[in-house]
């Protein structure tokens, strides 16, 4: 069974900023291909989202947040998400943030669900 994937408003803002940054610094076709891959990775969370590890930030946040990595080397981005289970094999995945691996992780106040 597939999970439903929702993208939080802050994650949409993150994605817009990332897309703008990559478009400014890369050829258009390369940027589009990379961004399409990012969206595909987010979409892959429909199936077995618990395959992704619990983020180290979960302890500080006091709730489970998982992490999916996209890209490689210096182009790696962290996709932070939570899982709301309706049953063990069904529920909602909520993408909370997307950050470059070298940036400071989002703080507790940034993980508030909207």
Task: Identify the role of each PLM range.
Residues 1-66, 87, 112:
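Basic, Lys/Arg-enriched alpha-helical interface segments
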């Amino acid at each position: 069974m597939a999970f439903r994937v929702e993208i939080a408003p802050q994650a949409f803002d993150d994605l817009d900023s990332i897309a703008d940054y990559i478009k400014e610094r890369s050829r258009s076709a390369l940027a589009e291909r990379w961004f399409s891959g990012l969206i595909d990775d987010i979409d892959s969370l429909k199936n077995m989202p618990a395959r992704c590890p619990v983020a180290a930030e979960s302890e500080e946040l006091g709730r489970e947040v998982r992490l999916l990595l996209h890209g490689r080397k210096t182009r790696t981005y962290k996709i932070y998400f939570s899982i709301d289970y309706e049953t063990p094999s069904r529920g909602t995945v909520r993408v909370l943030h997307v950050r470059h691996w070298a940036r400071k992780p989002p703080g507790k106040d940034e993980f508030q669900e909207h």
